[in-house]
Amino acid sequence: EFVYEQKTEPHRVDLAIFLNGIPVAMIELKKRTAGQSAGVEGMRQYRTTRNPKEKVFGFDRRTLFYLVMDEFEAFVATRLDGKETKFLPVNRGTAEGGAGNPIEAGKHPTHHVWDELLERDMLLRIIRDYLFIDDEGKMIFPRYHQLDAVLKLERDVRERGVGGRYLVWHSA
């Protein structure tokens, strides 16, 4: 738990990831089996109880992204803006081409967030190579399918060398 103060009243975020003492990610965890979902309660919590004027939540000053997840789905926002906060899914999609994540024996459907995206080297790479502020002032965080496609292409080029032809077909 990460405790911060909002006008002398302590508040908590379930998890915070720091890099050299600087908060780079905040994570709210929900449990759908307890009646909470990332897509409803988690997003509402960020939109209504996290003041974007707090230093720790200030855009482009401290925290780079905000995850909310339950056992089945994960979502990310790069800027807290009260009720206007926009979340995008960070899910792999199902084998049938649907939204969400596939079910794998012995793993939560959102294990890819822990095992891949928040893995130390990958998190540093996302911060270094993929997070950026576009011309409109929006922080861009790679969607899972985009990052996955780029990593597969890189791996193939390393194995086969340059000069290959690729068609990347993806949808969110």
Task: Give the predicted meaning of each segment.
Residues 1-172:
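ATP-dependent helicase/translocase motor core
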